[in-house]
Amino acid sequence: MEEEKLERSIRKSEIPGLTREEEEAQLAKVIGIAEQNLEQAKADIRLANEDLADLMETYDAKEAEGLALWNNATAKLNAYQHGMARLEKARKKPYFGRIDFQDPRLSFLESYYIGRVGISDEKAEPVVLDWRAPISSVYYENSTGPCSYTVSSEGTFSIDLKRKRTYEIENDHLKDFFDSDVVANDELLTKYLAKNKKAVLGEIIATIQQEQNLIIRRSPKTNLIVQGVAGSGKTTVAMHRISYILYNYEEDFRPEDFYIIGSNRILLNYITSVLPELDVYGIRQMTMEQLFIRLLYEDWDEEKYMVHTCLLYTSDAAD
């Protein structure tokens, strides 16, 4: 798969420029592609709605065949709607970063923009990479120079990072951009927070720190415990980790495989409202009290949850 991507990139004859004028032209180009994709998504949703309406007129929901067709059509419609939601988010701020690098397997420089969601042109060539893509980790973890990224089940690839650029884009307009030797991610985060004390999630994605990124991208096949003081970003990292796992391990994990356990409903409601911003839907949640009730009354397994009684003795001296 990775080799196929590299072969496709060989056909790219143009690398985006470095000046402000060239960057503004590139932004306009990407926004144009995003708008085309958005119009196509709207057309797909209209057709999916028509197909669902036809099925409802043709089949009775009580029929096994009809119910199966209804469910498939509904799932297809939901997928289109989620896709359109992603495109709408990318429309006014399609990307926040860029990496230029040399792959030793190729004889030319490669360049990729990184955003909250991936954007592809009509030929299915990526013009913006999703922040959860394996190679996007280079943007978060490395300074310029030799580095590497890992693709699950394919191995680790070494590259030479030539440039890491961060963009400040608002409502279709390029306000500013910085190279890694001018401003670091933590400085950019400080700038965002100074502008808006309650930074929106899209800006947080752009300013994920190296240590946070390592936690987010760690393999889900092993247990992971993250400790930190209140307000240190544990919940934010956990939400991004769920999004990353569902994106990169879709054959192994589904949304219903996750449970978010919180101390109160206020926290859980906040998490539920934020997860769709990370392209995550259908995650189940419960409070600690609900968890204990479920363990005691719904999922109780005498062999798994054994209660051992014991007697405590106190000596006369202790009395």
Model feature map: region roles:
Residues A238-S243:
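Motif I (Walker A/P-loop) of helicase-class P-loop NTPases
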Residues A230:
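The conserved Walker
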Residues I215-K221:
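Phosphate-binding P-loop
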Residues V226:
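Hydrophobic anchor at the beta1->P-loop junction of P-loop NTPases
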Residues L246-S315:
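Alpha-helical nucleic-acid-binding subdomain
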Residues A318:
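Conserved Walker B
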